[in-house]
């Protein structure tokens, strides 16, 4: 939408998974989702600042942030490359307990994934129809036209990357809670999958 290739996706996905896992292990499975999304916003903000304020090429900015996030993720995970969540209460275990004895028993993974996808789609449908959402879309199509319309393309780029990375981190958080573990390489190849899906 912004006509920007964000190569920090791999690191951001792992960042969301790591932050979500750490918060979930501390006993807050729902708060972990919000924390992971906020971590993604931070990652997107740094990437956007490198591109817009420091004049770094979008590809290089993504590579820089992705590389930096490796060290950040190790620090978040307490210096370990793996977090085991086998005895941790997650949104998936809570949903599993709630669905016990119902026809949906054993379908908690699909159900939570479906809920997450629906919520994201609903948010984007409404957000992209707002004034800010339309400005973000216009920035990707023609930044010169946006400038002539007295819209700040720097601001719209920052917001766009923050929103995109928050959803990337959300995906990482949900995957970590689903498989009950986080590995430092959990996000490897995510940017390839994202580009292929486009």
Task: Describe the predicted segments one by one.
Residues 58, 62, 66-129, 158-159, ...:
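Transmembrane helix-bundle core of multi-pass membrane transporters
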Residues 10-11, 122, 179-198:
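Glycine-rich helix-loop "coupling/hinge" segments at transmembrane-helix boundaries
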Residues 28-67:
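Alpha-helical transmembrane segments within multi-pass membrane transporters and channels
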Residues 43, 106-183:
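Helix-loop-helix "hairpin" substructures at the membrane interface of multi-pass membrane proteins
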Residues 1-29, 33, 49-55:
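Single transmembrane alpha-helix segments in multi-pass membrane proteins
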Residues 1, 22, 45, 49-54, ...:
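Membrane-interface helix caps of multi-pass small-molecule transporters
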Residues 11, 30-38, 60, 110-115, ...:
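Hydrophobic alpha-helical transmembrane segments
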Residues 7-15, 55-65, 135, 185-190:
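Cytoplasmic-side transmembrane-helix entry/capping segments in multi-pass membrane proteins
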């Amino acid at each position: 939408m912004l006509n920007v290739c964000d190569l920090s996706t791999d690191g951001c996905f792992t960042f969301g998974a790591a932050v979500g896992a750490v918060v979930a292990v501390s006993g807050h499975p729902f708060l972990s989702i919000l924390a992971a999304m906020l971590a993604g916003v931070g990652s997107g903000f740094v990437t956007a600042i490198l591109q817009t304020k420091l004049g770094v090429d979008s590809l290089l900015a993504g590579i820089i942030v992705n590389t930096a996030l490796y060290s950040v993720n190790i620090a978040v995970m307490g210096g370990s490359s793996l977090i085991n969540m086998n005895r941790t209460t997650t949104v998936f275990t809570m949903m599993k307990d709630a669905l016990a004895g119902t026809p949906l028993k054993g379908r908690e993974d699909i159900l939570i994934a479906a809920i997450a996808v629906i919520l994201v789609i609903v948010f984007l449908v409404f957000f992209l129809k707002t004034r800010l959402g339309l400005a973000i879309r216009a920035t990707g199509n023609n930044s010169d036209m946006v400038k002539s319309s007295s819209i700040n393309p720097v601001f719209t780029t920052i917001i766009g990357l923050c929103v995109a990375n928050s959803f990337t981190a959300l995906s990482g958080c949900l995957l970590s809670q689903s498989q009950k573990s986080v590995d430092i390489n959990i996000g490897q190849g995510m940017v390839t999958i994202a580009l292929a899906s486009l």
